[in-house]
Design a protein with these regions (language model features):
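N-terminal interaction/assembly modules
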Residues: 1-124, 141-259
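Short, well-ordered alpha-helical segments
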Residues: 129
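A short pre-motif secondary-structure segment
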Residues: 132-133
Length: 259
């Protein structure tokens, strides 16, 4: 039994074995005996032979032929079973614990994106998880979670003057009270209204960084599922124990605390 990490095993299965699925003897070694033959075909036709992914999401190899290893097929089937998995994002999820957030801007944006993802649902569906795993396996790396916090700036007028805001309470036609945010600057007195305040905003969007860290955690959760699923189901391989690293960015937080 060959011992392998779940990541290495999946990479082997998808890049070395499952590419044989759908290759067919008519387009495999019989018709294109080498990579040079493939280059020759390109020179003659002016284009590469078009290929669609096989049932495992892998482009069939022009060179490889024959049947894939039985363990690789088990790996491919396990990844396909991820389509039945449904993931969730808990309330209060904090993918940036290493960032200072004195004005709550990061938390507010994370919650906005979380709510958007929960409503749409496509990024939490098993189909997305299976596709994410296939992509990461083929690239031999997980999603890039590295991110730097953008600057916080005061909301300002076009001339750069910081704007003032204040809250006022009013009543509707039914006598119910509600609060609205209005201009906090008294232009007649040329000074802010009592209780007026400045507001801050992030200088650039962090939506992409939020989704990247969400996908990192999905990738790790999926690896846990696959490692457990394949643990006792292989003929010639043994999956090493796997401990998901859901927050690799936490080490950066610790480094900042010690600095």
């Amino acid at each position: 039994m060959k011992k392998m990490s779940i990541e290495a095993f999946l990479n082997w299965a998808f890049t070395k074995e499952l590419c044989k699925v759908g290759s067919g003897s008519n387009v495999g070694l019989a018709s294109i005996p080498s990579s040079w033959g493939m280059i020759g075909s390109y020179a003659a036709l002016g284009t590469m032979i078009d290929r669609s992914p096989n049932g495992y999401g892998v482009i069939p190899d022009f060179i490889e032929d024959g049947l894939p290893h039985a363990d690789a097929v088990r790996a491919g089937d396990a990844v396909r079973r991820l389509t039945s998995v449904a993931l969730d994002i808990p309330e209060g999820w904090n993918p940036f614990p290493e960032w200072a957030d004195d004005h709550g801007l990061v938390a507010a944006e994370v919650e906005r994106v979380r709510a958007e993802v929960m409503i749409k649902g496509d990024r939490l569906a098993g189909r997305h998880v299976a596709a994410l795993v296939t992509t990461c396996v083929l690239l031999n790396r997980g999603p890039d979670w590295q991110a730097s916090k953008p600057r916080e700036t005061m909301i300002a007028d076009k001339d750069g003057t910081p704007r003032w805001f204040c809250q006022k309470t009013s009543k509707d036609a039914f006598g119910r009270s509600y609060t609205i945010e209005t201009d906090g600057y008294n232009r007649r007195a040329r000074k802010p209204h009592r209780g007026a305040y400045h507001k801050y905003q992030l200088a650039s969007s962090i939506r992409g960084a939020i989704l990247d860290r969400m996908e990192w955690q999905q990738w790790q959760a999926a690896l846990s599922i696959l490692a457990a699923d394949l643990k006792n189901d292989l003929l010639a391989h043994e999956i090493l124990p796997f401990e998901p690293d859901l927050e690799p960015w936490a080490s950066e937080e610790k480094m900042q605390e010690c600095a």
